[in-house]
Design a protein with these regions (language model features):
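Non-catalytic signal-transmission and effector/linker regions of two-component phosphorelay proteins
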Residues: 1-27, 216-217
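Acidic, metal-coordinating helix/loop segments flanking the phosphotransfer/catalytic sites
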Residues: 52-70
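Short amphipathic alpha-helix used as the core "switch/output" element in two-component signaling
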Residues: 57-61, 83-95, 112
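Acidic catalytic/metal-coordinating carboxylates
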Residues: 54-55, 80-85, 102
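Receiver (REC) domain active-site loop signature in two-component systems and cognate sites
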Residues: 76-77
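C-terminal output helix
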Residues: 106, 126-135, 181
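Basic, Lys/Arg-enriched C-terminal extension of HTH/homeodomain DNA-binding domains
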Residues: 194-217
Length: 217
């Protein structure tokens, strides 16, 4: 790849981390060994951890797709294409962000990948600074998706009545107004409200509102 020996400005790069303060892992998926090697070299130059895979199927068999990460994947691969991989991630509501690698004449396919939800695409040979930009975008995206996925799991624990109370709080209604709207006692509202805060892991109403807004966005 033409730019694999270009210098990378580390001073401009801040390594994103997950909720455990660990650097996000970059998964490189390509059936060509030379591409995997070159891409791994560029990503390692940024100080990021990377893991290489020769096929998307092997990746899916061995990786937890519900953990935030970034994939840099070729579009045209045997057994499972990059598009099929993106569709699989979508189907399973995975937070992982995918960057598609494209060759000449595959721009239409790359655009379709963006429509499917890919974070970005890169043309081969990969430019190191273009890769850095794409990784930054993908890392931000996977962390946002992971946060939303976590909130969805918390919200799914609420009962129907608790969801009603939660959305009344989102509207800014007081307990007595919520009681009137839902035809329940103020005391019952207080009990539901307490459960909502606990299940949604919110310390304050403002934190709860922020999480509910993310669900509605």
């Amino acid at each position: 790849m033409n730019d694999q020996h270009n210098s990378v400005r580390h001073s401009e790069w801040q390594t994103p981390v997950d909720s455990n303060n660990e650097p996000l892992l970059i998964h490189i998926i390509d059936d060509e060994e030379s591409v995997r090697h070159s891409c791994n070299f560029l990503i390692s130059s940024l100080g990021l951890p990377a893991q290489v895979w020769s096929s998307a199927l092997t990746f899916l068999q061995q990786v937890d797709i519900y953990y935030p990460a970034v994939i840099v994947s070729d579009l045209m691969m045997p057994a499972m294409s990059g598009q099929a991989l993106q569709a699989h991630l979508n189907q399973h509501d995975s937070p992982i962000a995918l960057i598609a690698l494209t060759g000449q004449g595959e721009i239409d396919d790359a655009v379709n990948m963006l429509k499917l939800g890919a974070a970005d695409y890169l043309e081969k040979p990969i430019n190191s600074h273009r890769l850095q930009e794409a990784l930054a975008r993908a890392q931000t995206l996977t962390l946002k998706r992971a946060e939303l996925y976590s909130i969805k799991k918390l919200y799914a624990q609420l009962t129907e009545k608790e969801k009603q109370v939660a959305h009344e709080l989102l509207e800014g209604n007081l307990n007595k107004n919520i009681a009137h709207h839902l035809d329940i006692s103020v005391r019952t509202v207080e009990v539901h409200r307490s459960q909502v805060m606990k299940k949604m892991q919110a310390q304050h109403v403002s934190e709860l509102i922020q999480k509910l807004v993310m669900l509605d966005s």
